Amino acid sequence: MTTFHSTRSTTDSLTSKQAIRKGIADDGGLFVTDSLGETHVDVASLAGKSYQQIAFDVLSVLLPDFSETELKACIDEAYGAQWSDEKITPVKPLGDDYVMELFNGPTSAFKDVALQILPRFMARTTPAGGDGNEKIMIVTATSGDTGKAALAGFADAEGTGITVFYPEGKVSQVQELQMSTQAGSNVNVCAVKGNFDDAQSAVKRIFGDRELANRLASDSHVVLSSANSINVGRLVPQVVYYFSAYAQLLEQQVINVGDEVEFVVPTGNFGDILAGYYAKLLGLPVKHLVVASDKNNVLFDFLTSGTYNRQRPFYQTISPSMDILISSNLERMLYYMSDKDTRLIAMLMNDLNQWGAYEVPEPMLAKIRSLFGTGWADEDQVREMIADCWNKNHYVIDPHTACGYYVMQQMPRDPLTPRVLLSTASPYKFPRVVNESLGLDVSGTDFECMDVLAEATGTTAPAALRGLETADVRFDHVVDIDGMEGFVEQAAKAL
């Protein structure tokens, strides 16, 4: 039986449904399973399968307590007509390399892959304490993309409410409008005075507050859960697209079964790339996973030195979704790389909490570095790469993907190993930055920038983004970090 426990202790023993409903462990750790890797996905049978079929193969290994009927229903509901490409995450040639587009979902960012299915998972979980009236309040901090994708996934979902916090003034105009215009009777959106790390840390504190939990349960029949990638139900759907990429490379006759592939992944919270590590543990032939960061290059420093130090300046950059100093999902990778040493992980995370830094043992770092590569791009390089990619390939990339594109250009190429760049968001979410980079007009609004970009490149803005210009703003709340808990409590009472 596959059970889940915290990265920091083995006291819990939860099913995947319980772990998904709970979100985060009581001790602040993240849910992991020790059986990861015991069962492999059959790579030889991937070619020719649809995304939905591959999702079933992968998720039935990772979430064995969901029945075949439940999983198929979740997959069918999540990966249907709301996607603009039937391949869901299509792989396309990009010069001598490949790009996997993760932005064809309803909110134009890679988060849709997981956040279209997470609410379906949640709907098939049951209350832990037997309270038949129990409702779930999803509480999430966003650096830009998660918020809208979570809102779109959970809007009007039965028995569920959602509250999203984002750092005031630190997301793009398009991202902010995507959230503030969200429809749905069970949704709440609030800006926070602070940066993403402040908001995410406060959300983690809210989850750890037993008194608040007791009040919410007794007053409102509400339990809290998370839609951030700390929730294992957010992470596992992302494993699927690594297998899908491999299937598409097989179909395009780029590789034969068993050939290794490298993936270059723009990431801040480490979830997107951790999914690639999970794919490798499930038998996918992954040679290297390369972390691409922006100027907030805490992961680059960690992977080169073995010391993780969040005591550093926080930069607000043109790739806002990666402006993160506390990379939550790294904890799961450290757990597996330390041979599942919960005591070590608890100690490292305590050091991070207390001193703002930790250092991993040298042998463990060597093991990590044998799989994970790393690089980062500053803002000038990001702009140059958006232009370079357009000039060389006639392909428009957003500023996050451009970090990955830069790192990929810097890496030595092995002609025998295909490289796949994960493209995490539509360029139309950041039209001003993209236009600046391409030397196009940026004098108008973000929406005028979209039209200029479409005209100049012969591409089309996603209708949901272009339509934001005339959408009604429903939410304009702003709170201090200290006011977040009160905001959640009010939202829970209204559920």
Where are the regions that the model predicts?
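PLP-dependent amino-acid enzyme catalytic core
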Residues: 1-495
